[in-house]
């Protein structure tokens, strides 16, 4: 860490029990709300190392390649274990992606956090651990097989169930809101927007 500033961020962890944290100007202060960035990012990155350790096999670091673990699970697990669901960190971006039908472009942090919350609520948080403890006949961690064994459903079915749930939630929430024309009359300004090319 090259600065004592604790309100700017980024970092990543790798399966070799290393984490890298660097600083850069960005919007961390907006989504952190009451938390300090350094505390948040250290906990998040250390959670990745815990995940890598839990899913490690005789293939060591190469096991990550063969596990088939989706990014949403890796990032969602770190979010689930170290953060709380809050407006600027997850909810606003999540809602926007759902209402625009763009869940396939969702950041794996938000996507995964939501899916891990759903997984824990539906199956119990012990299924998260059971998924990571699974090893196939070659003694390798296989996410899809471990997920199916722990939950009883495929990852594909889980994703579809999750999609239905979040769509139902956000569209139900939206349907309770007034539209702008119910609030009052809409007026247009007497000029048109034009772009000036220099």
Can you describe what each PLM-predicted range is?
Residues 37, 193-194:
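Beta-rich catalytic cores
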Residues 33, 59-64, 99-101, 112-114:
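Flexible glycine/proline-enriched surface loops and loop-helix/loop-strand junctions
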Residues 1-62:
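Juxtacatalytic substrate-recognition/specificity segment
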Residues 72-89, 95-153:
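Active-site-proximal alpha-helical
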Residues 36-38, 68-77:
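Alpha-helical scaffolds flanking conserved acidic
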Residues 196-198:
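Conserved small/polar residues in nucleotide/adenosyl-binding loops
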């Amino acid at each position: 860490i090259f600065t004592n500033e604790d309100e700017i961020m980024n970092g990543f962890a790798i399966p070799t029990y290393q984490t890298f944290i660097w600083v850069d100007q960005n919007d961390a202060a907006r989504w952190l709300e009451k938390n300090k960035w350094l505390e948040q990012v250290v906990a998040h990155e250390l959670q990745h190392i815990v995940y890598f350790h839990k899913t490690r096999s005789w293939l060591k670091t190469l096991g990550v390649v063969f596990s088939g673990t989706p990014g949403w699970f890796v990032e969602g697990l770190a979010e689930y274990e170290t953060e709380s669901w809050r407006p600027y960190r997850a909810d606003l971006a999540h809602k926007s992606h759902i209402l625009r039908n763009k869940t396939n472009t969702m950041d794996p942090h938000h996507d995964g956090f939501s899916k891990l919350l759903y997984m824990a609520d539906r199956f119990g948080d012990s299924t998260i651990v059971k998924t990571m403890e699974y090893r196939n006949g070659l003694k390798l961690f296989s996410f899809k097989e471990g997920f199916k064994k722990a939950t009883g459903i495929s990852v594909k079915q889980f994703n579809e169930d999750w999609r239905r749930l979040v769509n139902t939630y956000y569209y139900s929430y939206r349907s309770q809101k007034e539209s702008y024309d119910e609030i009052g009359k809409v007026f247009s300004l007497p000029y048109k927007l034009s772009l000036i090319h220099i």
